[in-house]
Amino acid sequence: MALVKTKPTSPGRRSMVKVVNKDLHKGAPHAPLLEKQFQKSGRNNNGHITTRHKGGGHKHHYRVVDFKRNDKDGIPARVERLEYDPNRSANIALVLFADGERRYIIATKGMVAGQPLMNGSEAPIKAGNNLPIRNIPVGTTINNVEMLPGKGSQIARAAGGSAVLLAREGLYAQVRLRSGEVRRVHIECRATIGEVGNEEHSLRVIGKAGATRWRGIRPTVRGVVMNPVDHPHGGGEGKTAAGRDPVSPWGTPAKGYRTRSNKRTDSMIVQKRHKR
């Protein structure tokens, strides 16, 4: 894996920096693990925009990734190949189990074709193996962590993501996330050893607006250049400031305002990610 800076043959390529991984499969993905994916463009069933700045972009199939990895315990497997996935920042790995079934999983850092893998409580503590947290030594770096047993991984799934197992107390373990938050999870929740691969993803430079449109992301217009009917910051004669603290188009404070309302899981957070 390497960062490649392109030659300035055009304004768009002048600042472009790409992540090149020669180990990725160059052919078509595994067809039985593909599903159709329809463009929603950020609209709901009424056609109203519920998520702004979405629309357009290149068509692509959804790769069915196994986030649970709980029904192949004890069955040896090996990595057939690594693949690019347009639906996420991390790369994925096509895994062949000894019973002949193939599945996609999130590729961990250092994973290569031919690498043996194992799921279950008897799996060795090696990068890429998936097992319950009760069987993982304290201090181990983990990724793809479940929040509820059997629900599938929800924490540390993006490129370069990881968490650290800090402690185990009774039925719960403490996990420190990249944000600094320390969270309690049940010891029967599963996790994968190691970090998520493609850690250089955050260092890429897209280079031009069109490449962002290819990804299905539409432009973000500043509220201060809108009309008063469209945004609280809008209006004024000539180039003017917002005239108030930054807010969203609906008047909610935009910077530093906490919006978390899930009180049901507050007891699972040992240390908040906020410093104060």
From Swiss-Prot:
Residues 50-59 have a biased composition (Basic residues). One of its GO terms (biological process) is cytoplasmic translation. SMART domains: Ribosomal_L2, Ribosomal_L2_C. The keyword rRNA-binding applies. GO terms for cellular component: large ribosomal subunit. One of its GO terms (molecular function) is structural constituent of ribosome. One of the primary rRNA binding proteins. Required for association of the 30S and 50S subunits to form the 70S ribosome, for tRNA binding and peptide bond formation. It has been suggested to have peptidyltransferase activity; this is somewhat controversial. Makes several contacts with the 16S rRNA in the 70S ribosome. This is Large ribosomal subunit protein uL2. It comes from Cupriavidus necator (strain ATCC 17699 / DSM 428 / KCTC 22496 / NCIMB 10442 / H16 / Stanier 337). The gene is rplB.
